[in-house]
Amino acid sequence: MKIAIASDHRGYPTKQELIKYLSKKNYEVLDYGTNSTDMVDYPEYAFKLGESVANKKVDFGIVVCGTGIGISIACNKVKGVRCAKVDNIKEAELTRKDNDANVLALNGSMPLYRVKDIVDVFFNTNFTNVDRYINRINQIKEYENNNVTKKFEEKEVRNDA
């Protein structure tokens, strides 16, 4: 399995530990930066990783920043990416089973043992292919492709009292 990984400066130490961990588990790991704890802006790294996932150059991605929130927001701007900010193994399992997430976002302050458990569950859980989940993912894809139906358009709000 080929894994892309990226972080900002606050996620860098966790990213480096994850690269070692994943390599020992025989995953092929592509590092999209950053390469130090010097302050950087996470969107650049999130977009690079997201493009590699969307273009199927890798099977999955992992992004890490101080909270996991900002980098996940940036990653989700890439068409075809379904990035989930995960804090525990239950969320890791469900985001794969129900949402077919292809990028995992992590908090760089989380203990490494917990990060490893989350990563293992994420990579070892398959999408369920249940119709209702497929339908929801297809709605997201449709929206991304600008095939938005009227029900998603903004409606005028009237305050007639």
Residue ranges with predicted function:
Residues A6, Y32, V64-C65, V86, ...:
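Structural motif
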Residues A6, R10-P13, I89-A161:
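C-terminal binding/interaction regions
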Residues A4-K24:
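Glycine-rich phosphate/diphosphate-binding loop of Rossmann-like nucleotide-binding domains
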Residues E28-M39:
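A short beta-strand-loop structural module common to alpha/beta enzyme folds
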Residues Q16-I19, I73-K77, D117:
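Short amphipathic alpha-helical segments
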Residues Y45, L49-K85:
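Helix-adjacent hinge/juxtasegments
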